[in-house]
């Protein structure tokens, strides 16, 4: 497991972020969520963050800049995630699924992110349907 801490920009606001390969999902606190598109959940989800159980009643579409590169990913909204080793409040916990989605790798020994696998373009898949005009007649 690796962890890197740094600020990322959400709607121009810098947010203290913990990139953590030991966390599957991504989480944001309400102060960040107010800058995002959110939706309420029909039923709450429960997660364990930092050894504590948290309840999520809403989710957000996290659109942000990581070292100048745009990302967009799904995030759970939780009231609090605690503080890092330096006592700074964690506002975003960027999990392994989002890191994989955006080609973000951690270099813990240098305390930095590796964005060399960031997708510069997205390739769509074209589906071709062979329709037999005589079928179903």
PLM segments and residue spans:
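Pepsin/retropepsin-fold aspartyl endopeptidases
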Residues: 1-137
